[in-house]
Amino acid sequence: MSLVTSLTYVLPHRLLSSLARALAYSQTPSTKQWLIDTVTRKFGVDLSEAQEPDPHAYPTFNAFFTRALKPGARVPDADPSAVLMPADGRISQLGPVENGRIFQAKGQSFTAAELLGDEAAAAPFNDGVFATVYLSPKDYHRVHMPWTGTLRETVHVPGRLFSVGPDAVRKVPRLFARNERLVCHFDTEFGPMASVMVGALLVSGVETVWSGVEIPRYGDRITRKDYRGKGVVLEKFAEMARFNYGSTVIVLLPPGVATLDGGLAAETSVRLGQALARRQ
């Protein structure tokens, strides 16, 4: 285990993330520009596809980090049976949900019930498929809909804020089921679909298109919001949320619905809108 990963066990996760949020929203010109320039240089951020390509035009670091893309920079797969990749990034893992468990890395797994915070909510995904997509600091940080769905419920599951970088994924047991996360349950024409936005060290929040910034007060209780009957319908490929720093999204599909694209594997670089799976 690397020194950085070892340190994440003892670091004050929430304090650091609160400080990161304050910096991310700072409008002090020297502060925000130093952050933008540092991240652009360190991670090789490409602004040529951004709707605003001038790094000096963003009022805050967060505005830069959650930047929009130019129209047409990403297009959905033309096959109507394609279940779409929800974000730019890299496949951490994908595959079947076997015996209710989701593979994290060699020797590491966690249950769907742990991830979703609910045994009953996890049951429909047993023997289904999952995909875990890691968004690095250089990536486009908006998450989109794999398929058209009606929002049924969101569940805020409190937890730690470990790094979700590759070393942590390999070494921290049950990482994604331990970090703070926002579970979004959708009803679709093929049944339930879940998109899980996993927080991480320095992630200052998740912002959804239906309720804005989701930064619940820290606590040890799961918080649910019921959206049934409220008509929150999001079309396939539409934006659903954005990370206010890099992290991970996990998509769960029920069994017998779709087959994962054969060209995908762990460590594959992916782009929003390409085929994640195809309807059976």
Curated annotation (Swiss-Prot):
Pyruvic acid (Ser) PTM positions: S247
Membrane topology category: Peripheral membrane protein
Active site per database record: D88, H144, S247
Essential cofactor(s): pyruvate
GO BP annotations listed: phosphatidylethanolamine biosynthetic process
Keyword match Membrane: yes
Main location: membrane
Cofactor binding summary note: Binds 1 pyruvoyl group covalently per subunit.
CC terms in the record's Gene Ontology section: plasma membrane
Superkingdom of this protein's organism: Bacteria
NCBIfam families, sorted: PS_decarb
Quaternary structure and interacting proteins, as annotated: Heterodimer of a large membrane-associated beta subunit and a small pyruvoyl-containing alpha subunit.
Identification of the protein by name: Phosphatidylserine decarboxylase proenzyme
Annotated organism of origin: Xanthomonas axonopodis pv. citri (strain 306)
Gene encoding the protein: psd
